[in-house]
Amino acid sequence: MMPIKSIVTLDQLEDSEYLFRIVSTVLPHLCLDYKVCDQLKTTFVHPFDVFLNNSLGSVTKQDELQAAISKLGINYLIDTTSRELKLFNVTLNAGNIDIINTPINISSETNPIINTHSFYDLPPFTQHLLNIRLTDTEYRARFIGGYIKPDGSDSMDVLAEKKYPDLNFDNTYLFNILYKDVINAPIKEFKAKIVNGVLSRQDFDNLIGVRQYITAQDQPRFDNTYAIADAARHYGVNLNTLPLPNVDLTTMPTYKHLIMYEQYFVDDYDRVPIYYNGNRVIFDDEIINFCISMRYQSLIPRLVEFFPDIPVNNNIVLHTRDPQNAAVNVTVGLPNMQFVDINRNNKFFINFFNLLAKEQRSTAIKVTKSMFWDGMDYEEYKSKNLQDMMFINSTCYVFGLYNHNNTTYCSILSDIISAEKTPIRVCLLPRVVGGKTVTDLISETLKSISSMTIREFPKKDKSSIMHIGLSETGFMRFFQLLRLMADKPHETAIKEVVMAYVGIKLGDKGSPYYIRKESYQDFIYLLFASMGFKVTTRRSIMGSNNISIISIRPRVTKQYIVTTLMKTSCSKNEAEKLITSAFDLLNFMVSVSDFRDYQSYRQYRNYCPRYFYAGSPEGEETIICDSEPISILDRIDTRGIFSAYTINEMMDTDIFSPENKAFKNNLSRFIESGDITGEDIFCAMPYNILDRIITNAGTCTVSIGDMLDNITTQSDCNMTNEITDMINASLKNTISKDNNMLVSQALDSVANHSKQKIGDLRQSSCKMALLFKNLATSIYTIERIFNAKVGDDVKASMLEKYKVFTDISMSLYKDLIAMENLKAMLYIIRRSGCRIDDAQITTDDLVKSYSLIRPKILSMINYYNEMSRGYFEHMKKNLNMTDGDSVSFDDE
C-alpha cells in the first residue's frame, strides 16, 4: 500500500499536468449543468504583481483590485515612514519595484501550524504574501495585502497583539510613487515629475516654496539637481525677482513648505534661521511641532484617536534668542488651539497628518466580501454538498482562519484540521492557468459540452470534391506527369500542368476516378508543388483525431490562375478557354479549402504551430484542414497493458496514454499562449475523457413522477414551445440550463413516431373491422334472404364487442405513446446532465406522460376516433336494430 504522504495531490501540480488532472478526474463527476459561483470565477492577485504585469489583473475583480491599490498605497506610506513596522519587503521607485533582501519584521507570535506549501504557480508578490499569511499573523498579512473590511456583518474581526492605523479612502499614492518620468535626484522620497520634458508646475511651485528656506550656499546645488532654472524659464518665472522669504513664524503665510523641507530635504540641505516674533528659535523640533500644530489644527483630535498617548497641550514653549543673543523662553498659547509634540518622529507624523488631511477631503472605499480574505463561515462550508466540496478543493487553494492565544492565524484548511484546531472561516484562492481562473475554465468547458448537439459528437468533416474529372487511366497518366514537373518558374509550371491536363482530358473516357482518402494529401501536395506553389504540411493530434494542415501560398483563386496564365503570354481569351477546358481540375484546386473541420483556424494555428514562413504575406494562403479519427489500437497503450504483470500494475497503466499525452501537449500550448478558453479545452479533449463526462457527469437527480407532477397541462396547449416551457419550468428546481432545443427535438421525435404508429393502428383496425363487417353481412343475409329475425341483444353484443376492440386498441396506442414520451423525457434529463432517482415507473406516470404529449397528437387521436365511429355507425345502420338508441359509440 502506498504511504499517504507519497500520494500526489492536486495542489502539488501545476500548469498542464494540473489542468489535465482536473479535466480527466474532476470534470467527469460534475453535473453538466453545474453552475460555478460567480465569486469563484475571479481570484486575488497582489497589486504589485499587477503593476509589473497588467495581464495578471484580468483574473481579478476590478473594483476589488482598485480598492486594494488604494489601501496598499496608504499602508505602504505608513510602513516606510514608521520606525517600528517595516513589514514590506519592497522599495517602490520610479517605474520599478525593488525587493529588499533583508528580513522583514516578522512578529514573535508565529503561526503554530507549520506551512509546507510553496505556491510556485503564483506571481512572486502574491506568493510572498501567502507565505507571510501562513507564517505570521493574519492581521499583518492583511496589512501587507491591502485588505479593506467590507460592508455588512459577514466578516471576521481578527485578533492581533498590536494593530496599526487603519485609514481607508480613495487615492493614487501608488501610481504617483511608481510614476516613471521623474528627476533622478539623491532624495528618492520626493518625486519631482517630468511632464512633456519639463518639471510639472505643481512640483515646481513646491520646490520654489522649499527653496526659500534653503541657505544661499546650498541653493545652487538644489537648483542644479531639480533643473529649477529650466523650469523657471518654461513657466516665465524670474528667480532673481522672487520676494524675500518670510522666516518669522508669527507672520508666515503658510507653513506648508517649511514642513515639506523637514519631511524631505532636512538631511541634504541646510535651512536658514527661523524666528518667532523677531527672536531666533533655537531647537528644530519646536519649530516643526509649532508648524504642524498650526497647519493641522483640525486634525489633532483625529490623530489622538490612533495615538492616544501622544502629548497634546494647550500651549508650547519655544526656546529663542533675542537679537542680543540672550536666551528667551516664549510660551505660546492661543484660544482654542492645541499643540502636539511628535516626539522627534517627524517624517512619520508629517506623513500621517497628510494622510488624515487626504482622508478628510476624500470618500471612503466600499467593497464587498472577498473570498480570499473574508471567505465563508466554516459551518456554511461544511453544509455544502459533496459536489461543491470536490469542485472547490480541486480548483482553489483552501485556507482556514483560527484563533490561538488571542491571535488569529491562517493556514491550509487540511493542516488546521490535522492539527485538531477549530476553523472559524474558510477562505478560497481560485487557481490560475493560462491567464484564466480554473473555475472559469471549468465553467466554460461544461457550457461547451452541455451545448453540444448530437450532430457535433463526433463532429464530422464536410464533404469535399474527391476527383478531377479524369478516369482511372487518365488520372494515373496525369499523376505520372506531375512527378516529372520540377524546378520550373511558377507561372510556367501552372500553364504546363493545366495544358497537360487538357491534353489528357480530350481523349479520356470513363467515369471520374475518386481519389482514395489515404492518397488525398499526397496528391494535394504533389499537384500544387508541381505548379510552383509553396506547400507546407503540419500535423498534430487534436482530441482523438489526427489533424493535418496543408498551407498553400499564394492563395489559390480563379482570378489568380487567370492572372498567372496571362503572365505566360496568354491572352485573356486564351486563359479563359484553358480554364474552361480544365474546369474539373481548377474546380478541385479552388474548392479544396472550402470545407472546414470542427476547429476554427485560430485553434489550428495553436495546435500546429509554424516556425518558418515563405511566399505571400500572412493570410494570403489557401488552408486545407483534414481530420482523421485515430484508430482504437493507436489510442490505447497496448505496450503498457501487456507489460503489466500484476493487477496493481495494470490498474496504474494509463490505457489511453497516447491521446492523453497529446491532450497534455495541447494544454501546454494553450497555457503558453495565455489565451486559453473552455472551448479550446473541450475541442482538444480526447474521446476517452469526453465519453466519461457524457456518461457519468451529473450528480443531481430528477424524479420522473415529480417532474410530471410539476407540469401543468393546458386545454389549449397544442404547440411545441408551450410544452417546452412547461418541461423547462419543471426542471428549474434542479438544473438551470435552457433546454428549449433539446425538448423540442425530443417531443418532435415523439410526435413523428406517433404519426407512424397511428398508421399501424389504422391498418390493424381496418383488418378487425372487416371481420365485424363480415359478421354484420351474415346477419343482414339471414334477415333479408331467409327472413329469420336476429334479436337486438345479439346485434348490441356485437357492437359492444367492436367498441371494446376500439377501446383496447386506443389504450394500447396510448401506452405506446406514453412510453415513447417517457423515453424522450429520460433523454432530456440525461442530456441535461442529471440522473433518475425513481425506483420504478408506475401506471400513474404513464397517464401523466400521455397527458403531456396528448395536445401534440390530438388531431391523430380525433382522426382515429372518427374513423372508428364511422365503422360503428355503418354497421349499426346495416344491422337495422329495432331499438337503435340502445347502444351508441362514445369516445373520450
Curated annotation (Swiss-Prot):
Residues 616-698 form a propeptide. Core protein 4a is the most abundant virion protein. Major component of the virion core that undergoes proteolytic processing during the immature virion (IV) to mature virion (MV) transition. The precursor is cleaved by OPG083 to give rise to the 62 kDa mature protein during virion maturation. Proteolytic cleavage of major core proteins OPG136, OPG129, and OPG098, which occurs at a late stage of core formation, is required for production of infectious mature virions (MV). This is Major core protein OPG136 precursor. One of its GO terms (molecular function) is structural molecule activity. The keyword Aminoacyl-tRNA synthetase does not apply. Belongs to the orthopxvirus protein OPG136 family. Pfam families: Pox_P4A. It comes from the Viruses. The record marks 615-616, 698-699 as: Cleavage. The keyword DNA damage does not apply. Interacts with P39/A4. Keywords: Virion. GO terms for cellular component: virion component.
